From Swiss-Prot:
CDD domains: AST1_like. The gene is YIM1. It is found in: Lipid droplet; Mitochondrion. The keyword Mitochondrion applies. This is Protein YIM1. Belongs to the YIM1 family. It comes from the Eukaryota. The lineage of its organism: Eukaryota, Fungi, Dikarya, Ascomycota, Saccharomycotina.
């Protein structure tokens, strides 16, 4: 029987809660010649899911259901005649579905996409080299967006990072920073990666691959990093400062920590000046300040407020590192589809130590 019920977690605007809605889908007619249909087995949540919900203002012409989530892992169940033969029925795939307020999201049973447009897709490879308790779909749903974000910071700003490079990571305990240190060490062979985190997270982050760790809870942050800089690092400044949590401590003293702009050094942020607060409006004066800084041509340093492109490169690399046993995505918790609200509450708590994954359909 070609007709199925497609469940999805949706919302109308920021005054309506997330809820499960259903729609009949004809699997023989729902896709174009250039599209594939993926049965999603697992998806994961990201802060952007909460942010776009909070920004969905109630408007008279905007009453259609909108969907959650971008990361997915599943199986191709249908493929159009013009789809590249690389993508076949029964292939297991993982990806990051790019959308803002779209009719489709990955927190649903089925996803229809054109892989030549939605390029952030790769095949799921063998995961047996990893010491993990998670099935391949749950494991793979946890990495596309965070890995792609880390990859973009390291590769897309014209820097030539390598053994002589030094990177400072603000927020070493995040999933993005975890991915970044793995790429920096296993792919780029970056000589020195310094992480900032709580003193309680030192052991965990040292095992992740950071060369040095600086506590944010034992004194003024710039002073603590400064001690490492003038001591162990012999006053050699950083090629890249990557902020994955939202911080503004270094802007007044940037020249003391970041190499000159002429050497193509960069300060890259994915969160702006302050840590996300899911109980407040996501766009405020601090957001405006970050946007102004990114657009200001008179800065004395290179600054980027990163957005994630839809690219194949980071998907292929992430899948390869997982297959090689060199990268195991961090997972905080796994929820069943019906418990989506508990999963969202966990994300909003800011206490998750890794990705929050939602299982949608069982592995076959």
């Amino acid at each position: 029987m070609s007709k199925v019920i497609n469940r999805a977690v949706t919302f109308i605007n920021n005054k309506t809660p997330a809820t499960i809605t259903t729609k009949e889908l004809d699997l023989d007619r729902c896709f174009k010649d250039t599209e594939i249909v993926i049965k999603i087995h697992a998806a994961s949540l990201n802060p952007i899911d909460v942010m776009v919900h909070n920004l969905a203002f109630k408007l008279p012409f905007n009453s259609s259901p909108k969907t959650f989530s971008r990361d997915y892992a599943g199986v191709i169940v249908k493929a159009g005649d013009k789809v590249d033969p690389e993508w076949k029925i029964n292939d297991r795939v993982v990806g990051n579905f790019a959308h803002i307020y779209g009719e489709q999201g990955t927190l649903s049973d089925y996803l229809i996409l054109d892989p030549s447009v939605q390029k952030a897709i790769a095949h799921i490879h063998d995961t047996t080299k990893l010491d993990t308790k998670y099935d391949p779909f749950t494991l793979n749903a946890a990495w596309p967006l965070v890995f792609g974000t880390a990859h973009t910071a390291l590769f897309d700003y014209g820097q030539k990072l390598g053994p002589d490079s030094k990177i400072l990571v603000i927020g070493a305990s995040t999933s993005v920073s975890y991915a970044l240190v793995h790429i920096a060490k296993n792919v780029l062979n970056v000589g020195t990666v310094v992480g900032i985190c709580s003193s309680q997270s030192f052991e965990h982050n040292k095992a992740a691959g950071f060369d040095h760790l600086v506590p944010y809870d034992q004194g003024p942050l710039t002073e603590e990093v400064g001690k490492l800089l003038v001591g162990t690092l012999r006053n050699e400044k950083f090629d890249l400062i990557f902020d994955s949590v939202g911080n503004n401590d270094f802007f007044p003293v940037m020249d003391k920590f970041l190499k000159p702009k002429s050497e193509n050094s960069y300060y890259i942020s994915i969160s702006g000046d302050y840590k996300n607060n899911f109980n407040k409006h996501p766009f405020n004066i601090s957001s405006a300040r970050s946007l102004f800084r990114a657009a200001n041509p008179f800065r004395g340093y290179n600054y980027a407020l990163e957005t994630l492109p839809c690219k194949r490169e980071y998907m292929d690399l992430g899948a390869k590192l997982i297959a090689d046993g060199k990268y195991a995505p961090k997972i905080d918790s796994v929820y069943n589809f019906d418990d989506y609200q508990k999963a969202m509450d966990r994300l909003k708590s800011n206490k998750a130590k890794g990705k929050v994954v939602i299982k949608i359909n069982g592995e076959k």
